[in-house]
Amino acid sequence: MKWSEISIHTTEEAVEAVSHILHEAGASGVAIEDPAELTKEREQQYGEIYALNPDEYPAEGVLIKAYFPQTDSLHETIAGVKSSIDVLPSYDIEIGTGNITVNEVNEEDWATAWKKYYHPVQISDTFTIVPTWEEYTPSSPEEKIIELDPGMAFGTGTHPTTTMCIRALERTVQPGNTIIDVGTGSGVLSIAAAKLGASSVQAYDLDPVAVESAEMNVRLNKTDDIVSVGQNSLLEGIEGPVDLIVANLLAEIILLFPEDAARVVKSGGLFITSGIIAAKEKVISEALEKAGFTIEEVLRMEDWVAIIARNA
């Protein structure tokens, strides 16, 4: 079978939104070529450094590659992807050039091409994200492994916003806590919460592809006795109280439900949220405070922030 590799040149800010659009359109695999990765060390447990080829990365911006089977409707699929991307600036998401190119690849090439971008990555003192096809042995009894299949949906769990959310969970989750993960995507935050000792995690996403991906990853990590996954729009119809809510979403989406978060999380409970570009920190903080939260801590990584807020 022949496959088409669709490459989109965009910005770091738009990576998650564009990746989501591609998965929604039916991509069978997505790879992200971000030149920022060239300055990061990726160490294996035996001290080797992953060698990344600068020639495979754009000089500026981010290149997102998605793989689609060649069908008679491919042109319509690409047109739909372009239309969805063109709408992003209306949500204050800068898309850069947004240029789209299409190349033909053989099945044996696409099946492994995108995997070269994914390796075990230690994202905190506690957690290492490991792709399912990699063999990895923890370096200490304290190290916790989260296995993910990034070919299914919604990235590898190593984006700065995901990393900060996991680090915030490490600081705040107490054994026996009840937690809701809004916009779960791959399920990585729910899995982390379960491995940190939560007694119950409800993971929700509006996208059925995300629900399927999260369910698979939850089972893969043997946390399905703690994490339940369901389809839902934000916190609509969800009853509390719970100890903690975590939401790694676009800033524009976060602004839709601070009041619902205050309703569902118990008094004195926490709301951890990210997906927030630094320029939008103030508007998110103000919305949370208006809903009755107190900002306890702001984590920063590259151009992104995560906020830990406590309910009144």
From Swiss-Prot:
Q: Name one GO molecular function term.
A: protein-lysine N-methyltransferase activity
Q: What is its EC number?
A: 2.1.1.-
Q: What is its main location?
A: cytoplasm
* One GO BP annotation of this record: methylation
As its record notes, the protein acts as a catalyst of: L-lysyl-[protein] + 3 S-adenosyl-L-methionine = N(6),N(6),N(6)-trimethyl-L-lysyl-[protein] + 3 S-adenosyl-L-homocysteine + 3 H(+)
Q: Which GO terms describe its cellular component?
A: cytoplasm
The record's comment on protein family reads: Belongs to the methyltransferase superfamily. PrmA family.
As for subcellular location, the record says: Cytoplasm
Question: What does the record give as the function of this protein?
Answer: Methylates ribosomal protein L11.
| Protein name stated in the entry | Ribosomal protein L11 methyltransferase
Family annotation (NCBIfam families):
prmA (TIGR00406)
Q: Where does S-adenosyl-L-methionine bind?
A: T162, G183, D205, N248
Instruction: Note the Pfam families from the entry.
Output: PrmA
Write out the entry's keywords from A to Z: Cytoplasm, Methyltransferase, S-adenosyl-L-methionine, Transferase
Enzyme type, top EC level: transferase
